[in-house]
UniProtKB/Swiss-Prot annotation:
PANTHER family xrefs: MITOCHONDRIAL RIBOSOMAL PROTEIN S5 (PTHR48277:SF1)
Example of a GO cellular component annotation carried by this entry: cytosolic small ribosomal subunit
GO terms under biological process: translation
Subunit structure as annotated in this protein's UniProt entry: Part of the 30S ribosomal subunit. Contacts proteins S4 and S8.
Start and end residues of each S5 DRBM domain: 17-80
Record comment regarding domains: The N-terminal domain interacts with the head of the 30S subunit; the C-terminal domain interacts with the body and contacts protein S4. The interaction surface between S4 and S5 is involved in control of translational fidelity.
This protein's name: Small ribosomal subunit protein uS5
Lineage, broadest ranks: Bacteria, Thermotogati, Deinococcota, Deinococci, Deinococcales
Lineage: superkingdom: Bacteria
Compositionally biased intervals (Polar residues): 170-183
Residue ranges of the region described as Disordered: 164-196
């Protein structure tokens, strides 16, 4: 009866979120009458539009564990700031002894990452990103580390609002401000070089 109810929920949920099961772990405990097995499932839910959630469910049967994990993932949804298909800046997410370096990438790069960071990034709607897993590569810890990184991402507008300042134009050589700053710096160096 519970499974029928959950299946109905799946139909309504499938239109809103995509799901991906990252792994199912089986544990056993030995009793006097024999061994009893339990299962733990790690599930990611995402709408490929900046919203993603993760959950772990435990039960005596795999389908029930997956349903529990999906319910937890729905409660733990976060919004990831996605700009032009990538993240706004480089960040390191941490959990326990796992650290994950997340870096923005240009168009056409794709998601270059391990299984867990790639799955989470794709369901969040990120199409270009670089990632490196540092420390422990335990799937649960890596997943939590990726979520830690995503939670701490800030757009330029959010940083401006937090600091109460204006966002300065980029000083890259491509922008007019950057070109003038570069030429002024070059002239200053040339002038001082002549004086010596």
């Amino acid at each position: 009866m519970a499974l029928t109810f959950n299946r109905r929920n799946d139909r309504t949920e499938s239109s809103e979120f995509e799901e991906k099961m990252l792994f199912v772990n089986r544990t056993s405990k030995t009793y006097q009458g024999g061994r009893r097995f339990r299962f733990a499932a790690l599930v990611i839910l995402g709408d490929r539009n900046g919203r993603v959630g993760m959950g772990i469910g435990k039960a005596k049967e795999v389908p029930v564990a997956i349903e529990k994990a999906k319910a937890v993932a729905r409660k733990n949804m976060i919004t990831v700031p996605v700009e032009n298909g990538t993240i706004p800046h480089e960040i390191v997410g941490e959990n326990s002894t796992s650290r994950v370096l997340l870096k923005p990438a240009g168009p056409g790069t794709g998601v270059i990452a391990g299984t867990v960071p790639r799955s989470i990034a794709e369901l969040a709607g990120i199409t270009n990103m670089l990632s490196k897993e540092l420390g422990s590569r335990n799937k649960v810890n890596v997943a939590y580390a990726v979520f830690d990184g995503f939670k701490n991402l800030r757009t330029a507008k959010q940083v401006r609002n937090l600091r109460g300042t204006e966002v300065r134009p980029s000083l890259s050589s491509d922008s007019p401000a950057g070109r003038s700053a570069t030429t002024e710096a070059g002239e200053g160096v040339a002038d001082t070089g002549g004086m010596q």
